[in-house]
């Protein structure tokens, strides 16, 4: 068993839970009640669900990798998931830093949850 992948999978599923519970309260509910036109509002709602699914599937994939460590495909899939979470974190950092907010790194702190998954997955793949 690969402990790094196990930790990454558990962390990713924790991130998914925070996204689903916190995101529903802090993002989805306000989005659905705002004055935005219905079509873009529903597209953003669907995108939120897509991210929820993606986070859960990534966590499950990492848990699976923790049990199958040593097979030839394990490293490639783990590096893909690590890159995936790095890209998510980078997207939040770029958006946050481009707005010009004071103390921007704490305004959208999602990157803080995403980077550990990437680091743990990369450590398991190395």
Which functions belong to the PLM regions below?
Residues 51, 78-92, 111-117:
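Hydrophobic alpha-helical membrane segments
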Residues 59-79, 96-100:
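Juxtamembrane helix-break-helix junctions at the cytosolic face
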Residues 90-107, 121-126:
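Membrane-helix boundary connector in multi-pass membrane proteins
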